[in-house]
Structures are given as C-alpha cells and as structure tokens.
Amino acid sequence: MIKLISITQIKSSIGRLPKHKATLSGLGLRYIGHTVLRKNTPSVRGMIKLLSFMLRIN
C-alpha cells in the first residue's frame, strides 16, 4: 500500500518563478491554505523539495 502525503500551500505564488508556479500546478495546489493528498513517490518528493519554503507537509 502506498502512503499518502498531505501537502498544504502556505505562501502565495505571486511573483514566483514560472518553474515554481508550474510545480505548484503539478501538485494540484491553487491558493494559500489549499491542501491536497498525494502518493509518496520520488517525483512528488522532488516537487516538495523544490517548493519546501512555501509548503507544509503533514
């Protein structure tokens, strides 16, 4: 069974690099306070690492 990660956006995407905005979109995050559940895969962990300064992981 694959474990799920709860990801919450805690900072705005306004003024961020296009690469960061695309990564937020890839995770399915749209606005501050938005929380999504994603599978704990290497690709998702890489996206989280790139955006660690604007996400909260539970």
Swiss-Prot record:
This is Large ribosomal subunit protein uL30. One of its GO terms (cellular component) is cytosolic large ribosomal subunit. One of its GO terms (molecular function) is structural constituent of ribosome. GO terms for biological process: translation. Belongs to the universal ribosomal protein uL30 family. The keyword Ribonucleoprotein applies. NCBIfam families: rpmD_bact (TIGR01308). The keyword Ribosomal protein applies. InterPro entries: Ribo_uL30_ferredoxin-like_sf, Ribosomal_uL30_bac-type, Ribosomal_uL30_ferredoxin-like. Keywords: Ribonucleoprotein, Ribosomal protein. It holds the Pfam family Ribosomal_L30. Part of the 50S ribosomal subunit.
